[in-house]
A protein has these predicted regions:
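Aromatic- and acidic-residue-enriched carbohydrate-binding clefts of CAZyme catalytic domains
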Residues: 1, 32-58, 63
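Single conserved hydrophobic/aromatic residue that forms the stacking wall/gate
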Residues: 1-5, 9
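Conserved, mostly hydrophobic/aromatic
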Residues: 24, 73, 97
Length: 189
């Protein structure tokens, strides 16, 4: 039932938005809760998913869902993008990865020949504080991130070969607005 509901939701988005790419998230999936969820465990058992040295069976369940959604989107002429958590459990065949928890997810995806958008929070999260004196700053959700650090970011990891570097497609800076109360606050950040 859940997968059918996901397809219906995605089908609605496809009809509204013409973009080739659909971002499917992949973060904020509470796998520790899935360990205790009887329905999740029943689904894991029914699918025959197993843990191994690299992935838990709950990560494999997320990969199953992401792969299903990717196939659905590909069948409708679209591509998926997801946060680097979609690497956990095995990456869907055509997925683009947005590496936000540092660069390691992007490096791993590029080594697997997947397109990558670098968006590491330690360089490109604009909802972080811009001054050390946080008491006199508009509210920020993260730590201190001066513009000098943002400008210093080199999105092409030296650890990748020239062939692997071709999969790094660009960068994205994020401003998450759940803690941004006003438009002027957003402009300041």
């Amino acid at each position: 039932r859940g997968l059918v509901g996901s397809e219906m939701c995605i089908r609605d988005r496809i009809e509204i938005f013409p973009s080739e790419y659909i971002h499917v998230g992949g973060d904020e999936c509470p796998k520790v809760r899935w360990e205790k969820c009887p329905k999740c465990q029943a689904r894991i058992k029914a699918l025959g998913l197993k843990s191994d040295k690299n992935h838990s069976k709950e990560e494999r369940l997320q990969s199953f869902v992401i792969n299903h959604i990717e196939k659905f989107l590909n069948d409708h002429g679209r591509q998926i993008i997801g946060w680097d958590e979609i690497l956990e459990g095995g990456l869907a065949p055509n997925a683009t990865v947005m590496s936000w928890r540092g660069e390691s997810g992007g490096i791993e995806a590029a080594k697997q020949k997947h397109d990558v958008i670098m968006t590491p929070n330690t360089y490109l999260y604009f909802d972080y504080y811009q001054a050390k004196d946080t008491e006199n700053e508009p509210f920020g959700i993260g730590g201190y991130l001066p513009m000098e650090r943002v400008y210093s970011y080199e999105p092409m990891p030296a650890s990748l070969t020239p062939e692997e570097q071709q999969y790094i497609k660009g960068v994205q800076a994020n401003l998450w607005t759940e803690y941004i109360a006003t438009f002027s606050h957003a402009q300041y950040m």
